[in-house]
Amino acid sequence: MADVPHVPSVMTADELHETVATIVALQQPSGMIPWFVGGHCDPWNHVETAMALDIAGLHTRAELAYQWLVDTQSPQGWWHNYYMPSGAVSDHKIDSNVCAYIAAGVWHHWLHTSDRAFVEHVWPTVKSAVNFVVSMARHDGTILWAQHPGERPWDFALLTGSSSIAHSLRCACHIAALLRHDHTNWSNALERLEHVIRNDVSAFEPKLRWAMDWYYPVLAGVVTGDAAANMLNDRWDEFVIPGKGVRCVHDEPWVTAAETAECALSLSAIGETERARELLECTRLHRDVDGAYWTGIVYPQVIRFPVGERSAYTSAAVILAAESIAGDTMASRLFWADDHPMHV
């Protein structure tokens, strides 16, 4: 059994394996991992769950998950937003952030396995996806959110999605450097995107209600140091319910375990490890008896919402945060703001 993160009061090593078993149970023969039984799969959260498989040492299953992305990618480099286990497309939208995230997942896989042959195998897929995403960049550095197949991209960008894209672009540059490929165009796109995120939030569609717009520039390693700490502290009381976790939106008492885990990951990324652990401990309230995690809880009634939903991506987010807090592998540094490891 592989060594896995062990974070007392959050998730023991044995509990992590229990949680990953609930993700494995969802994985289809094709490699696809839907949100829940009978649910859809989106490529972003699919990558998140693949990373959880790698953390548990299930590298063959993680590679099967990435192979599903190889097999379903369009010739233009994109994926649709939602797929069903049958292979049918349930949402045809093309989301730039969804398409970019494979780079973060593949870099994470490399940090766990040092399997150069696998990275070379998926390189054409990563390259095509990242080139597509960069093609959606505007002159100001922002990257347009989405489009429908064959249509022009929508004319606005999102702060959360763009921050995640910045992290994915950084990972893509690491992969390119590992394989000795030129990545000048990607590096330039990353520099422009980071500049606008740090200096002109008005360039993005306002989504101030949403917790992800609050912490994602920190999680993605775009805003760092004192500025990152200030960003998290400034709206902490708006989004965090003490002892419960992070609200999905600041004006509703709906706490989601994934947002709680991602916010904890943001704290870990800037070195606030103990504060991250304390926040991630709140996700224990979402843990079910078999190790799966309920997506959200509404307070004070303690109503699980969406009703009956235990999502694989939620479990994966908790595992990723636990890995970062444990900090005992190179892969745990994936989101660390001051440590973007090349190791080529």
Regions found by a protein language model. Name each.
Residues 1-9, 47-61, 101-118, 163-180, ...:
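Well-ordered alpha-helical scaffold segments within catalytic/enzyme domains
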Residues 2-40, 63-95, 99, 123, ...:
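Extended glycan-interaction surfaces of carbohydrate-active proteins
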Residues 26, 35, 39-47, 51, ...:
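N-terminal beta1-alpha1-beta2 module of alpha/beta enzyme domains
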Residues 34-37, 116-120, 180-184:
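Short, surface-exposed loop/turn segments at secondary-structure junctions
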Residues 159-200:
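Active-site neighborhood of glycoside hydrolase catalytic domains
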